[in-house]
């Protein structure tokens, strides 16, 4: 089940509601990443507290461990991990194709060795759909070939054509399995605008209920990523949700929304938090730096998260230096809360027709830097 309602547009920025089997999502939305079925350093109550509306699970990793036979006993991923709101799962393709020296790609699918025990495994569109059906995620993704950013035009064309054939197979398998959830297609084409348009045209013929932009933030220069966003975002079908995969910084989210993106995921806020890199309204803060040793202020005096309301920079500095788990937890709560606040503010700005003003103020504040 998927119903997308577009409430308001301000330029290309959009404000909508996405209705899924496990609840409604207000867009634009950021999805914290729970690779192994948990968002690192967060429990489900923490996620509720920061107002996370949907999280992402990783098909590849959950397939390998704990395995489908375990998740199936709980009726799907929601029951297994104790999360009652929507979940999106990726197809597993990105992780498999990252194993470049351990995998073999054919039209049928991809053969690879398990990095856990060396077992020979095979992932195809049909198997990916089977896995995601067992996981019972609210949004599943087609299996696609993740084209590297530096691909030649001919490589990119062959890759996107394979992805389109796999999209058709994914959709058929999804329907044959009578999966009651939603399946998104993925626009590929590397850094070639005309190939992106070719990919989009093929996906539109398959009539997926939502579309994602894949193959960005895979090593290409930032200006190239933004060029592709400018080219693809505004031409995605207006009546369907638009998902930018694996992106990114706070500035990337704002740029994406400005060019028609509704959904984002990225490990950056959680990974950076564990490394002591904190995002604030006035730039980024490295809590491990010695200057915070005696600082009684919170991370961000305007922030309402649990970490900022209760603890000083000095304490967080100490926790990070000591390698305490609590430090990673508090840092992660803050970073994910900050991302959720950005999204909420963008939703409100679009509703009020003031997105451009909000965007300008956001960049001005971020450029100021922290003290």
Curated annotation (Swiss-Prot):
**Top-level taxon:** Bacteria
Q: State which Enzyme Commission number(s) the record gives.
A: 2.4.2.29
Gene3D superfamilies linked: Queuine tRNA-ribosyltransferase-like
Q: How is the cofactor bound?
A: Binds 1 zinc ion per subunit.
Pathway where this protein functions:
tRNA modification; tRNA-queuosine biosynthesis
Question: What does the entry list under GO cellular component?
Answer: cytosol
Q: Where does substrate bind?
A: 90-94, 144, 188, 215
Q: What does this protein do?
A: Catalyzes the base-exchange of a guanine (G) residue with the queuine precursor 7-aminomethyl-7-deazaguanine (PreQ1) at position 34 (anticodon wobble position) in tRNAs with GU(N) anticodons (tRNA-Asp, -Asn, -His and -Tyr). Catalysis occurs through a double-displacement mechanism. The nucleophile active site attacks the C1' of nucleotide 34 to detach the guanine base from the RNA, forming a covalent enzyme-RNA intermediate. The proton acceptor active site deprotonates the incoming PreQ1, allowing a nucleophilic attack on the C1' of the ribose to form the product.
- UniProt cross-references to HAMAP family, sorted A to Z: Q_tRNA_Tgt
Oligomeric form and interacting partners? Homodimer. Within each dimer, one monomer is responsible for RNA recognition and catalysis, while the other monomer binds to the replacement base PreQ1.
Indicate what this protein is called per its UniProt record. Queuine tRNA-ribosyltransferase
């Amino acid at each position: 089940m998927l119903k997308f309602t577009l409430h308001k547009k301000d330029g290309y920025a959009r404000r909508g509601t996405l209705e899924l089997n496990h609840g409604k999502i207000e867009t634009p939305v950021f999805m914290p990443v729970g690779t192994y079925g948990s968002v690192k350093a967060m429990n489900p109550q923490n996620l509720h507290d920061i107002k996370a509306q949907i999280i992402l699970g990783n098909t590849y990793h959950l397939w390998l461990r704990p395995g489908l036979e375990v998740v199936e006993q709980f009726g799907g991923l929601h029951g297994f991990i104790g999360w009652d709101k929507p979940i999106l799962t990726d197809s597993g393709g990105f992780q498999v194709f990252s194993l470049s020296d351990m995998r073999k790609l054919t039209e049928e699918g991809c053969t690879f060795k398990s990095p856990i025990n060396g077992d020979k495994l095979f992932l195809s569109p049909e198997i990916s759909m089977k896995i995601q059906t067992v996981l019972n995620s609210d949004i599943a993704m087609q299996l696609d070939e993740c084209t590297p950013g530096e691909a030649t035009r001919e490589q990119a064309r062959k890759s996107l054509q394979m992805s389109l054939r796999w999209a058709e197979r994914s959709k058929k398998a999804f329907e044959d399995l009578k999966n009651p959830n939603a399946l998104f297609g993925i626009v590929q084409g590397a850094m070639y605008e005309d190939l992106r348009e070719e990919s989009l045209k093929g996906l539109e013929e398959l009539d997926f209920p939502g579309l994602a932009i894949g193959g960005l933030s895979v090593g290409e220069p930032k200006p190239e990523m933004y060029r592709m966003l400018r080219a693809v975002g505004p031409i995605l079908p207006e009546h369907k949700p638009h998902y930018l995969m694996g992106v990114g910084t706070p500035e990337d989210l704002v740029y994406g929304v400005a060019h028609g993106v509704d959904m984002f995921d990225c490990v950056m806020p959680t990974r950076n938090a564990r490394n002591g890199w904190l995002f604030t309204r006035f730039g980024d803060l490295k809590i491990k730096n010695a200057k915070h040793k005696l600082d009684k202020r919170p991370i961000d005096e305007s922030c309402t998260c649990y970490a900022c309301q209760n603890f000083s920079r000095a304490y967080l500095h100490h926790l990070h230096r000591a390698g305490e788990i609590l430090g990673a937890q508090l840092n992660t709560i803050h970073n994910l809360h900050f991302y959720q606040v950005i999204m909420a503010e963008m939703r409100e700005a679009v509703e009020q027709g003031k997105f451009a003003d909000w965007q300008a103020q956001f960049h001005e504040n971020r450029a100021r830097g922290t003290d």
